[in-house]
């Protein structure tokens, strides 16, 4: 499996979120094991979106430089860069930066269908049932051994990367509002493979 190029992510965030369905998330672990999952659920976030970490930042009208502090600044990185952060002090979440460099945007990978390296995933997660391994963003990060060390790394090169996969027809794709947010709930920016049992069980916001 070869990594998707940066050009795949150098596009509108909503397009990347939709097109990542069916692609593979791959981690070639230090142990020599390859962990692979088929992406079945994503969410999009952009700088004009109140649910985005970069929404509080502004630009200097003369220089165009981003003004403000906080982790949202990392969403202005080059497309294909990892944006990994911790929530509730417990769960790491994997996002990939989108849009041309200097424009904030990212896609959150919410769920994958595990395909390779299942025993390693079970060890990392401490659960046996395949359906419970990666059906949520915190779960998949734990199963794939993804933590803050991957923040700002390039997801267009090994060891952690996205690879081409199966295309998902539009009639197989469902959309909803995103999960776990209080702002921007009117945007149907969550995409998932309908009827796939590895999609996260949480309910959409709103």
Swiss-Prot record:
Record EC number: 3.2.2.-
Cross-referenced InterPro entries: Formyl_transferase-like_C_sf, MPG, MPG_sf
Keyword Aminoacyl-tRNA synthetase: no
Keyword presence, DNA repair: yes
Gene Ontology terms describing biological process: base-excision repair
Disulfide partners: none
Signal peptide (residue range): none
Pfam family, one: Pur_DNA_glyco
Catalytic class of the enzyme: hydrolase
Keyword annotations: DNA damage, DNA repair, Hydrolase
GO molecular function annotation: alkylbase DNA N-glycosylase activity; DNA binding
Top-level taxon of origin: Bacteria
Coiled coil (residue ranges): none
Family: Belongs to the DNA glycosylase MPG family.
PANTHER family in the record: DNA-3-METHYLADENINE GLYCOSYLASE
Protein's name in the database: Putative 3-methyladenine DNA glycosylase
Species for this entry: Salinibacter ruber (strain DSM 13855 / M31)
